[in-house]
Swiss-Prot record:
It comes from the Viruses. One of its GO terms (cellular component) is host cell cytoplasm. It is found in: Virion; Host cytoplasm. Homomultimerizes to form the nucleocapsid. Binds to viral genomic RNA. N in nucleocapsid binds the P protein and thereby positions the polymerase on the template. Interaction of N(0) with the P protein prevents the uncontrolled aggregation of N(0). Residues 1-17, 39-48 have a biased composition (Polar residues). GO terms for molecular function: RNA binding. Residues 1-48 are annotated as: Disordered. Keywords: Capsid protein, Helical capsid protein, Host cytoplasm, Ribonucleoprotein, RNA-binding, Viral nucleoprotein, Viral RNA replication, Virion. The keyword Cytoplasm does not apply. This is Nucleoprotein. It comes from Tupaia virus (isolate Tupaia/Thailand/-/1986) (TUPV). InterPro entries: Rhabdo_ncapsid, Rhabdovirus_ncapsid_C, Rhabdovirus_ncapsid_N, Rhabdovirus_nucleoprotein-like. The keyword Ubl conjugation does not apply.
Length: 430
């Protein structure tokens, strides 16, 4: 593609109008598997430490308030290798066979495991010899929950998760130790690549084998699914906000930058509609280093979707983090129109009637619609109707729209600092 050139009238010189890229290009999961049809690789600590000894050391370290992450990974792998589940179906993703129908399911079946280069010796001074196999469920849940709690950026939410975890651990067999706040592991463990791969394996496996007693481990791993994919998951959110299917919802994208990002997310052959795909775990499994589905990659779509949601009083949208986006004024105007249309154009169906009776309202279905002039607002929620009207009226929002949306935006006055809700209030309601 040829680049536009900038011409200086003053110096009569021309220049390439280029700016440095501020981030690496996105990496799609499908592209990674085109290069190699192999499972992702998990590196485990190289140690002969038995499960019995590792169990006692882990319990002792949990009681002591400081757990060696290498020991934790070694112990988790030893426990997970003991778990098997009945399986009767082939499991494939991007042409990679994860399980065949003749194999029993194992939590680490989606990765190839290799040993670390160096032997690992663990400090055995801190141990609890009372640890038994009964402790495995609560200890694995505890160790995996460090991922979810550590990734929580809001301290109040982090405290809430710890409270929920401790209530859960109290229901398990064994002599559990409650988690406390301010563990050093919260900061470091979610940044360890192989710990994150373990977390992803557990969540991916028990997302498929939901009836297993070990599926409770997903309490701590659930946030690995669709990590750095918030813009992608917002597609369903947007569709639900409007109450229409996704195709009809996306027809309302009238801003070029928003539409570009939607196309980026909907690139084909990425298994977006396959629930047991590698795609939701592409970040933690190391398949992609730069998600094409993150809010950072799709700031225009993020603002568009959550401006609509904020004006519709969706708590998820109101609290969404505000990111600087290109063409914000056009995005806000597009969102204003959508909210005005979908909140003032009611679409109902009379779904029931008395048996053997006739509804008079059914006869109205045969009445031809009135053709509107350029000043008459469409009575539909059809995107093409409204785009045509806007085009005929020089893309100026109706006065009724501005007044209606302003009232809604004023309700967002107390939104969280740095949120989309606060941004919408300051731009449209203040």
């Amino acid at each position: 593609m040829s680049l536009s050139r900038l011409y200086s009238k003053k110096t009569q010189s021309s220049y390439n109008a280029t700016a440095p890229l501020d981030r690496d290009p996105p990496e799609y999961p499908g592209d990674a598997f085109k290069k190699s049809r192999n499972k992702p690789t998990l590196t485990r600590p190289k140690s002969n430490l038995s499960l019995d000894d590792a169990r006692c050391m882990i319990k002792g370290q949990i009681q002591n308030g400081s757990v060696d992450i290498e020991l934790a990974k070694h112990y988790l792998i030893l426990v997970l290798e003991q778990i098997t589940e009945d399986n009767s179906d082939d499991w494939t993703s991007f042409g990679v066979q994860i399980l065949s129908r003749t194999e029993r399911g194992r939590p680490l079946c989606m990765v190839n495991i290799q040993l670390d280069d160096k032997d690992k010796t663990f400090d055995s001074q801190v141990k609890d010899s009372t640890a038994t196999v009964e402790d495995d469920l609560w200890m694995t849940t505890y160790l995996l929950a460090i991922y979810r709690i550590g990734r929580a950026t809001n301290k109040n939410y982090q405290t809430q998760l710890i409270d929920e975890l401790n209530k859960l651990l109290a229901t398990f067999p064994g002599d559990y130790v409650p988690m406390v706040q301010a563990l050093q592991a919260f900061d470091s463990w979610p940044n360890d690549p192989n710990y994150c791969k373990l977390v992803a394996c557990v969540d991916m496996f028990f997302s498929r084998f939901k009836k297993s007693k070990w599926a409770i481990l997903r309490f701590g791993t659930i946030s690995s699914r669709y990590r750095d994919c918030a813009a992608l998951t917002a597609l369903n959110h947007f569709s639900r906000l409007l109450g229409v299917d996704l195709v009809d919802a996306l027809e309302w994208s009238f801003v070029g930058r928003v539409s570009d990002e939607i196309e980026q997310m909907l690139k084909p052959d990425q298994e977006l509609d396959k629930v047991d795909s590698y795609t939701p775990y592409m970040i933690d499994l190391g398949i992609s280093k730069a998600s094409p589905y993150s809010t950072v990659r799709n700031p225009a779509w993020h603002l568009f979707c959550h401006t609509v949601g904020s004006l519709m009083m969706s708590r998820r949208s109101i609290n969404a983090r505000h990111l600087e986006a290109p063409d914000q004024s056009n995005i806000l105007s597009n969102a204003e129109l959508i909210v005005f249309v979908f909140e003032t154009r009611i679409k109902w169906l009379k779904n029931f009637r008395k048996l053997d009776s006739v509804d008079a309202s059914d006869q109205l279905d045969q009445v031809a619609p009135v053709v509107l002039g350029t000043k008459d607002l469409p009575n539909t929620t059809n995107a093409d109707d409204w785009f045509s009207w806007m085009k005929l009226n020089n893309f100026e929002l109706p006065d009724e729209c501005g007044r209606y949306v302003s009232k809604l935006a004023k309700k967002l006055k107390d939104s969280r600092e740095g949120s989309v809700g606060q941004f919408v209030y300051l731009r449209l309601g203040d």
